Amino acid sequence: MPNFEISLLYPNREASEKNAQGLDNPKISMETLEALELDYAIELQNSRLCDMFTMDKEVIEYRQEVFKDLLENEELCTLLNKLCPILSDISDLRRLSSESDATDSYLYCITEIELYITAIELLNDGLTPMKDNLKSSALVNLYEHVSELTKSEYYADLNIRLKELTKRVREVRSVTIGVNLDSRLRPESAGVLSVNNESFKSGELLQKILRLDFKSDEYTCIASLQPFKKGQSDNQQYVLNNAFNNALNDVFKSSMRSWKKVVSAYVLENADFLIKLSPEIEFVTKATELIKNLKQAENPLVFPEITSFEDKVFDVKGIYNPIVAMKTGSKMIENDFAFDKNGMFYVLTGPNRGGKSVITCAVGHVFALAQLGLPVPASYAKISAVDGIFTHFPTSAEDTIDKGRLGEECARLDEIFEDVTENSLVLLDESLSSTGSYEASYIASEILSGLSIVGCRGIFSTHLHELGMMIDDINEKTKFQGGERIDTLVAGIFEGERSFIISRQKPDGKSYARDIASKYGISLDKIIEKVKKNK
């Protein structure tokens, strides 16, 4: 059968090669994934999550169809989860085979093809009952290829040959060795007389002579069997092992070597696609687990409509933070969020723990999950992909030895401008919190002016309420250089309580303080009243 290529993530070879060459990969670093906690949400062992992202609309839509099949067919997820450890075992065997001696290598080769056949039969038996329910071209093609493979004469012949050789090898229980002695009864040379399918048993010379039933028993020894390694040094064990394996190699080498060639040819032509699929299968199964966990809390999920890259659309209804939802297992407060001509970048202010960081991350989550091909945490979403997600979040590991904390923050912010484009997303959370509000507001206004001129989308979540008051001046300054408009958002508070509702309005820092002070009795009228009572 001809070599077959299939992918659960890419619709054709060209798209796969573009991804491998980094031509359609958005710049999303592992640091960004850690900041958004997506490495926690989708934990991969055999690949890197940052390599799974794409900017290609066709690729995203191709993946969406795969995930729809996975979500609509529970048994499909179960099937792929069963397949994962088998493929992992094959990879481990390949590694061990390359590190082992000839005998072990041949045995690993037999086990490898057994695992391949197990995997293919598992797929065929699992996909056949659900074939009429599959809609994605990836999974339909996978079923058709596996079905064709299992029906081929070559596959049937391979099974027969495997069973014959497996029986030969796996039924070996003992080896009869002939040893020549010198005049002083010291071993001089040795060779294998026979390979047996029965084990030797301990016995005694007298029993062998007197008992008729032992006389014709070739597998009862005339002395007790001794453990192979008893009384031997490590060096002696190695020498004996090596000699024994060399003898076995001579017995099996002709059939084993010819078999290994058959196995290699079969694997390369028909089964190696499973190993190539292994990281993709791990990714889609782990990602589907995330989606199922979010569904259990009855939070909305929707496959986004993907628009042209150049449209720079982001219109989302009912957005929420999926990481918080997964950790709490509760129904989340939802918000509506959009980037538009009046606000491609936002300054988000509000009370501490009022939801600023939560919504900032949520916007990053929607872009990231969309560009993995997954449904996003929202009830409606229309999105243009980004060519990178850049974050600057608080960290407890600032390298402040050379620059000081403010210097380090500025250095990290400056790095963003090395790669950011008009099609990027920038998320800044409490940046410049290491200095006073006057200095921080000045530096922040310079950064916002630069990001406006770049034309990227993003959010600056900050405690600097006065920064929101500077937005009109920043927009006025950058409009003559073609800058995109910046707008303001406010994390809501009602009667001193955080509402977690994000509103598009100008900030009023005093209102937060006034509401909270009133709640805890820290107003001038109440203070005077308490002072009078104490007199």
Locate predicted features.
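Conserved amphipathic alpha-helical "coupling/scaffold" segments
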Residues: 1-186
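Alpha-helical initiation/capping and key positions within long helical/coiled-coil segments
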Residues: 108, 269, 273-276, 405-408
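Long, hydrophobic, amphipathic alpha-helical segments used as structural scaffolds
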Residues: 124-135, 166, 173, 185, ...
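Structured, charged N-terminal subsegments at the starts of enzyme catalytic cores
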Residues: 171-241
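A short, charged
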Residues: 215-230, 245, 345-359
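Extended, charged coiled-coil "arm/hinge" scaffolds of SMC/Rad50-like chromosome-maintenance ATPases
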Residues: 229-265, 271
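Charged, amphipathic alpha-helical linker segments immediately N-terminal to NTP-binding catalytic cores
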Residues: 276-324
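ATPase nucleotide-binding head domains, primarily ABC-like/P-loop NTPase cores
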Residues: 309-535
